[in-house]
Amino acid sequence: MQSESHSKQAIVLLWIALILILVGGLLANLVQTNFGKIDVRDIRFVGTNGTVMSALLYVPDGVTNKTPAPGVLCIHGYFNSREQQGSFAIELSRRGYVVLALDETGHGYSDPPAFANAFGGIDGLAYLRSLDIVDKNNIGMEGHSMGGWAIGHAANVFKDGYKSMVLEGSGTGGIFGVPAGDATWPRNLCVVFSKWDEFTSTMWGSFDPKNPDPVDMTVPSNVVNANRLKAQFGTTQPVEIGKIYGSIADGTARQLVMPPVIHPADMQHSGTVGAAVDWFQKTLTGGKQIPASSQIWHWKEIGTLIALIGMILLLFPVGSLLMSGVGFFKELQMTPAAPIAIQGSKGWILWLVGAVLFAGIPATFYLHFTGLATDWKFNASTLFPQGITNQLMLWVLLIGAISLGLFLLWHFVFNRQASAADYGLSWGTGFMGVGWMKILKSFLLALTIAFIAYLTLAVSAWFFKTDFRYWVVTFKPIDALHFRIFLSYLIPFAAFFVILSLAMHGQMRPGGKEGKEISMGKEMLINIVLMVLGFLVLLAIQYIPLISGGSLTYASESLLTCVIYQLIPIFVIVALVNTYFYRKTGHIYVGAFLIALLVTWSLTAGQVTTAAIIT
């Protein structure tokens, strides 16, 4: 009877998950298409040297070759993709602009390597200008971060091929060959630079040792005094925020806007989006004059978040139903060994020390270990072609080695009487008692669950032209290239998550009174805290000085600091999935393999490919 009740609960949960995926995808699609008034097309075109470029093309109703509309090229930043320009694309297209949201080279579905062909910006503008539905006398460009450098290159090649541009958290001059700006180039420029931007010195700091900036350029508020920005605005005085310099009619207009937001949130803030909309309404003709403050893109993000939650929720009932309903997997259902009883104040002190180490070590060594990839020349290669993923892989492998060493030390000093079975590592004793076939079945179960989750994404992406995402956390459909990359990274990440699961459930699993199990919900919550607390502390260390008017504590580590925003939600998913399947199977493998599949999928499908590999 209990098994039947659990199956009914799983079926109900399955339907809830599927409904969330459907409702989220439908909401995202309705907003993305402005309720059917925008045709969103997933396109490919051939750029420089045969490079296949990927983009989303937003075409408003009524736009034809006989009634062309103004066009805007939108380009994302480093290790992002075309979907993260959705806020700009939605707001501009609903105002009548044809929008090309481009995947930079090596990003999304555009051919690698990253940085090639001026990031793809020149090819993107050339393609937009080739469309007969676009008014070639009314073209704008918007680029976030590295996307700003891409449109800078495009503006340099097509000096009269655009009318205005917006740099979101980006700059001109001295960066990857982007020319220095002045009072006349680029044409009609709006600089949207966050109040708490982490990349001030990179984007606007002086690279000329003979002409250093008069202020500390790691402090965002000092950007108004930057030599390069003042030259861009044609002034020797601090640039005034909000003031329009020059002339729109002459193409020399300039404006600085500084919304209260951080660099990676430039794509998700009404102030940054509104500033871009307002600028194009001032500098381009032919669009609808909908107030810049009237924005609906938030609902698309809410839709894809709902769908993402639905997919994660789906993992639990699918796993439960497969184990209870498919004979091949039934033997994996087992009760976990009793948790270790925490006895007296000494026991609690020992557990708390372990908790501090578990939560603190990954965050403490995050910036150092990821940096070792550069020191050790662990560069992007044919086998491991993603630079940032390489840094993360090296970090987790080193953390895994430390964690395994500490676990073994704890076992031999404090818990020598425990067996491998007590830790969820084996089903018996000795080599044959490990249960090798059950480990294989655990992997096959995890693979089946992940595949079913992937199918929901594939169907949703095909039908709604949206993926599962929120902000920087994304699950994208995998093309052939990214599937190869996924396979390359899967084994190293799986090794780490097996060790993580061993430490989480073998050592850190808390017991209730007299060593009895606590509820699964409480255990999930404890594991979430263990997974993310260290990184929340690291973010506080970095950002409290920045938001207080200074700079990041470790100002040179701005890029890897921004990656943490992707890691924290992933670690929440890790804690939930790992805990659930440990409680269902009594062993660490299904959860470890499943999160390895999910995390490797999320990272590799959404990360930048920096090596020049054959597609």
Where are these regions (language model features)?
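An N-terminal hydrophobic leader/cap segment in hydrolases
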Residues: 4-46, 54-56
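Soluble extramembrane regions of membrane proteins in the secretory/endomembrane system
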Residues: 39-297
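Alpha-helical transmembrane segments of multi-pass membrane proteins
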Residues: 25-28, 316-321, 359-368
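Juxtamembrane/start-of-transmembrane alpha-helix segments at the extracytoplasmic/lumenal side
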Residues: 294-308
